[in-house]
């Protein structure tokens, strides 16, 4: 005697239930989306480093959340077409996440900075100030970089890095580290306003996978590999 298995019931979300869900969660969803929008809109290193870090965390969480949702769609696909598309989207999301980690690890090996795992950019601006290596992300591949010192406060492209510097502390070179190569910027113009104020313009001079000599005599530190960074 053969027993027939009862098929599992298929739950269909009706329009009325969708409207009810939106009515119940509309306020919370609106607050969450407003928060994310504000963070993405105003999260810049030149404005607030704290807000920028929150923005990076949100962007970083997008990949695992996307992978989870695409896998969920594969498990609960409505039909074969949705299943096929969900599988494709899952594979693409996983591949892109793996590529992100590979590039981030390569950049971390090059720089030694955890800014290498920034999901927004693979360009890390690096400058050696009296033996302290500052590393910060920049969005674009600039042809020139502006370094400003205002009453001892160090700024690069509007990003505050540190204090206690004079215009004489500005190095002759700085770099922008990327996954596959380094961009060297040479100081092309220097204007002294006072002992603790001035600015310099650095112009891109070389691009390649090479090392720069350390500014510290006898330290053995490689400027391009950027250890002891902040």
Curated annotation (Swiss-Prot):
GO terms for cellular component: host cell Golgi membrane; membrane; viral envelope; virion membrane. Keywords: Glycoprotein, Host Golgi apparatus, Host membrane, Host-virus interaction, Membrane, Transmembrane, Transmembrane helix, Viral envelope protein, Viral immunoevasion, Viral matrix protein, Virion. Glycans are attached at residues 2-3, 5-6, 14, 28. O-linked glycans consist of Gal-GalNAc disaccharides which are modified with up to 2 sialic acid residues. It is found in: Virion membrane; Host Golgi apparatus membrane. GO terms for molecular function: structural constituent of virion. Pfam families: CoV_M (PF01635). Residues 1-24, 77-84 are virion surface. It comes from the Viruses. The chain crosses the membrane at residues 25-45, 56-76, 85-105. InterPro entries: M_CoV, M_HCoV-like. It is a multi-pass membrane protein. Signal peptide: none annotated. Belongs to the betacoronaviruses M protein family. Component of the viral envelope that plays a central role in virus morphogenesis and assembly via its interactions with other viral proteins. Homomultimer. Interacts with envelope E protein in the budding compartment of the host cell, which is located between endoplasmic reticulum and the Golgi complex. Forms a complex with HE and S proteins. Interacts with nucleocapsid N protein. This interaction probably participates in RNA packaging into the virus. This is Membrane protein.
């Amino acid at each position: 005697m053969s027993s027939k298995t009862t098929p599992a019931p298929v739950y269909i979300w009706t329009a009325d239930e969708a409207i009810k869900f939106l009515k119940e969660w509309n306020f919370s969803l609106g607050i969450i989306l407003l928060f994310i929008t504000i963070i993405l809109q105003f999260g810049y290193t030149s404005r607030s480093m704290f807000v920028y870090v929150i923005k990076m965390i949100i962007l970083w969480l997008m990949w695992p959340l996307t992978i989870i949702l695409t896998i969920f769609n594969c498990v609960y696909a409505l039909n074969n077409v949705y299943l096929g598309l969900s599988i494709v989207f899952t594979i693409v999301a996983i591949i892109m996440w793996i590529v992100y980690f590979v590039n981030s690890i390569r950049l971390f090996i090059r720089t030694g900075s955890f800014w290498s795992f920034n999901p927004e950019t693979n360009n890390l601006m690096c400058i050696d100030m009296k033996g302290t290596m500052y590393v910060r992300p920049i969005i674009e591949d600039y042809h020139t970089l502006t370094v400003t010192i205002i009453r001892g406060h160090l700024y690069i492209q509007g990003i505050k890095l540190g204090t206690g510097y004079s215009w004489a502390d500005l190095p002759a070179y700085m770099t922008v580290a990327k996954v596959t190569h380094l961009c060297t910027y040479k100081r092309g113009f220097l204007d002294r306003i006072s002992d603790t104020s001035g600015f310099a313009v650095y112009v891109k001079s070389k691009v390649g996978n090479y090392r720069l000599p350390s500014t510290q005599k006898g330290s053995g530190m490689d400027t391009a590999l950027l250890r002891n960074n902040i």
